[in-house]
Curated annotation (Swiss-Prot):
Enzyme class name: transferase
Keyword Methyltransferase on entry: yes
GO terms for cellular component: cytoplasm
Annotated Pfam families: Methyltrans_RNA, PUA_4
Name assigned to this protein: Ribosomal RNA small subunit methyltransferase E
Known role: Specifically methylates the N3 position of the uracil ring of uridine 1498 (m3U1498) in 16S rRNA. Acts on the fully assembled 30S ribosomal subunit.
Catalytic activity: uridine(1498) in 16S rRNA + S-adenosyl-L-methionine = N(3)-methyluridine(1498) in 16S rRNA + S-adenosyl-L-homocysteine + H(+)
Similarity remark: Belongs to the RNA methyltransferase RsmE family.
Organism from which the protein derives: Aquifex aeolicus (strain VF5)
Keywords carried by this UniProt record: Cytoplasm, Methyltransferase, rRNA processing, S-adenosyl-L-methionine, Transferase
EC numbers: 2.1.1.193
UniProt-annotated location(s): Cytoplasm
Gene: rsmE
Record has rRNA processing as a keyword: yes
UniProt-listed GO biological process terms: rRNA base methylation
Length: 229
């Protein structure tokens, strides 16, 4: 079933606009064909009621049961020098159920804060596309970039992926926790000084073995472990 995204409801109708109208027509939805629409944390089965050039009115047939992520994960991701890699990370984090995404600026990361802020709108669009693909009912919140030195451990379990220095294995993390803060480095990882600063603040170093992973692979690995165990 094709899934679309709506920000507007009129009674029993959900309204598709702009880019969603274009996507709808590309899918060539047939008359009386049912499709899904995500709206305000819920997914509905709908049919077309009315259609014109600017909008499509979708009549709600039924509300589907939806699942929320079992863990509340905040991902602190060092902004990769290749910003296209960040697009991939945002998409994967959304599909995996991360609730909050915070870009961080570290020694080896991309440094231009204004450029990062400009990318935020694109990342929000990627979140919507990933929601439709994965049938996730709620968006991942994307926050403004912060400096690594400003991070504070605020979750039940606070983790830094640290494949270059000391670290525990994922099995030694508290997998019963409900809230996690996960800090992931850029290409080349964190410096020894940065790792030490975060450990002194209370972040637990975690080592993913046996090999050194790309930053986008590390995100998928650690989030999958936390969500499913």
């Amino acid at each position: 079933m094709h899934v679309f995204y709506s920000e507007e409801r009129r009674g029993n109708l959900l309204i598709l606009r702009e880019g969603e109208v274009k996507h709808f027509r590309v899918r060539r939805i047939e008359k009386d064909e049912e499709f899904g629409v995500i709206h305000e944390g819920k997914i509905y089965v709908c049919k077309v009621r009315r259609e014109d050039k600017r909008e499509i009115s979708c009549e709600i047939v039924e509300e589907l049961e939806t699942k929320l992520p079992p863990k509340d994960i905040t991902l602190y991701q060092s902004v990769t020098v290749d910003l296209k890699t960040m697009d991939t990370i945002v998409r994967q984090a959304t599909e995996l159920g991360v609730l909050t995404f915070v870009p961080i600026i570290s020694e080896r990361s991309f440094q231009k804060e204004e450029a990062i802020l400009k990318k935020t709108e694109k990342w929000k669009r990627i979140v919507i596309e990933a929601m439709k693909q994965s049938r996730r009912p709620i968006p991942m919140e994307i926050k403004k970039p912060v400096r690594l030195s400003d991070l504070i451990p605020e979750s039940e379990e606070n983790i830094i992926l640290d494949n270059f220095y000391e670290g525990v294995k994922p099995k030694d993390v508290n997998l019963e926790a409900k809230t996690y803060s996960v800090v992931v480095g850029p290409e080349g990882g964190f410096s020894k000084r940065e790792s030490q600063i975060l450990r002194e603040k209370g972040f637990k170093s975690v080592l993913l073995e046996p090999y050194t992973l790309r930053t986008e692979t590390a995100v998928v690995s650690i989030v999958s472990i936390l969500m499913n165990f």
